[in-house]
C-alpha cells in the first residue's frame, strides 16, 4: 500500500482503537448504570475525590454533553442520554464504516471529519473535566487519546487515498478513454 504511515499496520491499529473506544464507552456506561442503581458503588476507576470517573459520569455534563438539557430545558429529553451511550454508537458506526469503506474517498473524508468533530468535543469535555468539575477521569482521558489517534490514522488514510485515486473532477477533465486506447500523457 502507498504511504509510509498507511498499510496493514494502520488497518489493524484502527480496528484495535475502534474496539478500545467501544470498550471504554461500554465500561463508562456500565459504571453510570451501577452508580445510579447503587449510590455506594465504588468503580474501579474511583481512586479518590480528585480521580473519580463515576462523579464525572453522574454530573450534569455526563448526559447529553451538558448541552442537551441546557438547549431543550428538559432533563428528560430523549436526546439527553449518557455520553457513554453516544460513544458506543459513535465508535460502532465509524468502525463499521471503516471496515466497509475500502478505498472510498468519501468514507475516508467522512471518518476524518467525524474525528475532527470528536476531537473538538474532547477538548470541550476536557475543559469541563479540568476547570469546572476539577477532577480527573481516567476513562475520559483514555477516550480523548483514542479520538486523537483515530484522527491521525484517518488523516493518513485520507492522504494516501488522495495520492492514489483521482478525484471526480480530475476524471471528468481527463475525459473518457476507450478500451484498448493508449494515453500518451499517462504512459510515457
Residue ranges with predicted function:
Residues 1-188:
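Membrane-interfacial helix-loop segments of redox and metal-homeostasis proteins
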Amino acid at each position: 500500500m502507498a504511504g509510509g504511515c498507511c498499510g496493514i499496520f494502520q488497518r489493524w491499529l484502527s480496528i484495535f482503537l475502534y474496539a478500545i473506544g467501544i470498550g471504554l464507552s461500554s465500561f463508562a456506561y456500565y459504571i453510570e448504570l451501577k452508580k445510579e442503581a447503587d449510590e455506594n458503588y465504588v468503580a474501579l476507576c474511583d481512586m479518590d475525590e480528585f480521580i473519580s470517573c463515576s462523579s464525572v459520569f453522574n454530573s450534569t455534563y455526563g448526559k447529553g454533553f451538558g448541552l442537551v438539557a441546557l438547549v431543550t430545558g428538559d432533563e428528560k429529553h430523549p436526546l439527553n442520554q449518557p455520553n457513554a451511550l453516544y460513544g458506543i454508537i459513535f465508535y460502532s458506526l465509524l468502525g463499521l464504516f471503516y471496515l466497509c469503506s475500502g478505498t472510498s474517498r468519501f468514507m475516508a473524508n467522512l471518518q476524518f471529519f467525524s474525528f475532527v468533530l470528536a476531537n473538538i468535543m474532547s477538548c470541550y469535555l476536557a475543559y469541563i473535566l479540568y476547570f469546572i468539575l476539577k477532577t480527573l477521569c481516567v476513562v475520559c482521558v483514555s477516550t480523548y487519546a483514542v479520538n486523537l489517534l483515530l484522527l491521525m490514522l484517518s488523516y493518513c488514510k485520507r492522504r494516501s487515498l488522495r495520492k492514489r485515486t483521482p478525484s471526480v473532477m480530475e476524471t471528468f477533465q481527463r475525459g473518457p478513454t476507450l478500451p484498448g486506447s493508449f494515453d500518451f500523457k499517462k504512459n510515457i
